[in-house]
Amino acid sequence: MWISPKTDFHEAELDELFWFTETRRTNELGVNAYVMTMISRNPRQIVAFDVDISIKANLIQQMVNSIPPFEKYFSDGGTIYLDVDFFGGHKRNIHNKNDTYTVEGINADLRHYIAGLRRKSRCFFRKLETLKAVLYLFINAYNKFGEAKRVYRERRPNCGRDFGFNHLHYV
């Protein structure tokens, strides 16, 4: 998975999305699927992800171990994070989402841009492998687009915040 060479390994956020696979009927939800994401705050990008039928500490541990260590990790109040060994400090937010706002926003982007993750959608994934493949492709494009925005804004600091596909030649 592509990660920006400008990644600041200071603060990471972790969260998970719940969804289902295999079938979609009004009385049957199929198999649970969880998308676990780890993001860097600067630049705003997904640095690791995994998909499984349940949230498991060993999968989150593999995500943490798969990239260079961050100084601080932030997660929601899920007790599963207590079983993960973080290299830096870990803050578990039990009462609010003040320290997980970035990962919540990125997870909202995943739901928005990937039809199979939308709520009340007619699309769904029949297999976890398909969901993993779609996420891998999307995350690569998402991270590269975010890098293109960063480069564009660096080169044109007074140009405003608007950025679209017509600006991609700046990368």
Where are these regions (language model features)?
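Residue-level recognition of single "structural anchor" positions
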Residues: 1-171
